[in-house]
Amino acid sequence: MKDTLFYKFIARPFVWFWFSLLYGCKVVGKENIPKNGRVVLAGNHTNNWDSLMLISVVPRQVHFLAKDALFKGFPGFFLRRVGGIPVNRKIHDKDALINAKKTLEMDLCIGIFPEGTINRTDDIIMPFKIGAVKMSHDTDSTIVPFIITGEYKLFRRNTRVEFFPGYKIKSDDLTKENEKLMKKISKELKKNK
């Protein structure tokens, strides 16, 4: 399935222009994102703008999992049109996981922040929930780790996103695989501090 017309011709160009003009973003490792097939982009969550910033730099449509509270009014309209998947974070939202897996089974790309929320702690990273690894494993998708560094400050141009080589989750020990993903992202964040 190709990018939706709304995404390709309206949402992505608008978001790209807005982010390029106001924030700028250095992108490293874009070649590590497969152009086709099932992909789970998994990385740290620093700010409310992270999803939109990734929409502006990833060369294919990204279907983000986002808290259901964001799916109201105009933001909700926009999120639905760009393929957003609402998640009720108060419960173990099986419907969100089912929708995300269906999206991957159509050979599309999912974006997820395994921390589950914006990291407002002093820790470099918060513990990961297992959803990204489980979805990747269950759908035989390539998981592509990424990090976001810098701050979204107007006209500062210090935001950076780096994508690392993707891999398939072959082991059934998902707890161990989740720790491996978390350690990889944590290690890269420490290098970039």
Which role does the model predict for each range below?
Residues M1-V40, P75, G83-G84, I98, ...:
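Membrane-anchoring hydrophobic helices of lipid-metabolizing enzymes
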Residues M1-K2, F6, L97-K193:
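Non-catalytic C-terminal accessory region of glycerolipid acyltransferases
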Residues A11, K35-I91:
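Catalytic core of membrane glycerolipid acyltransferases/transacylases, capturing the structured
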Residues W18-S20, V57, L79, T103, ...:
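A generic structural signal for well-ordered alpha-helical segments
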Residues G76-F78, G84-G111:
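Helix-adjacent hinge/juxtasegments
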Residues L22-G24, Q61, R81, D107, ...:
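A generic structural signal for alpha->beta connector loops
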Residues V27, L41, F64-L65, G84, ...:
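Generic preference for hydrophobic
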Residues C25-K30, W49-S51, F71, L97-I98, ...:
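A generic local structural motif
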